[in-house]
Amino acid sequence: MSGFNWDDENINHIARHGVTPEEIEEVFNGDPEYAFSYTKDGEERYQAFGVTARGRYLTIGYVERDELIRAITAWDMTRRERKVYDAKKIDRQK
C-alpha cells in the first residue's frame, strides 16, 4: 500500500469513536497485526490491530482501493481483541 484515502465520510466516522486519521496512520506505519478478512458488498474488507505512538491500542476496519488504505471504522481494542493481539505478537517473536 502506498498511502491512505481520507475524506469527510471516513474521517467523521472514526471521529465518532474518538479516533483520528493520524492515529490510524501511526498503526499502519508501525507493526500492525492483521486479524482476518471478509467480503461485504462485493468488496474484500480487512481488520488490523495495532498501537499508536502514544500507546493506544486500536482495532481498524479497512479496505484497499487503488493501492491506498481506506479506513472504514476504528475503535479502542476490547479486552478480547487485546488478548488476541498480544498472543499474535508473542507468537511472532518466537
Residue ranges and their predicted role:
Residues 1-94:
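Ribonuclease/tRNase effector modules and their secretory precursors
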